Every structure is written in C-alpha cells, then in structure tokens.
Amino acid sequence: MISIKPGIYRHSKKGGEYRVLGTAAHSETLEPMVVYEALYENPVSQLWVRPAGMFEELVEINGRKVPRFVLVREK
C-alpha cells in the first residue's frame, strides 16, 4: 500500500517544489510509482514518475538523513 498523499512536496536536495498527482503501478512489474509535476519550468519534462520506495526514502544531506521529499501542504 502506498502512503504518499497528493499535495505539494519539496525536494530536500534540490529545493524544487512538485505536485504529487497520484500513484500508479508499473505496467510490467506492478511496482508502485509516484506521478508528480514540477512546479517550475523544467526543460526536460514537467511530469515525472519515480518508484514509491525511492520517493519515500531517506537521503543524506550535510551528514543528516532526511526524507527525499517533504510534504509542504496536502491537496
């Protein structure tokens, strides 16, 4: 079960904000995925998909473990 709520999230390393649109399943593996949209101009893409486990994992920043994405406000 995916516990990621729709809303606005901030990327802990890069600082950009993203709107989580929802969750999905990979068509071949059924791996849970998060579908999200950059809230800034991005020349590569506005829509992104990331494995849910990776979206929720902790990353190291300045020697501290913090969530990769932090919920700023719920939808």
How would you label these PLM feature ranges?
Residues 1-75:
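Mixed-charge, low-complexity intrinsically disordered regions
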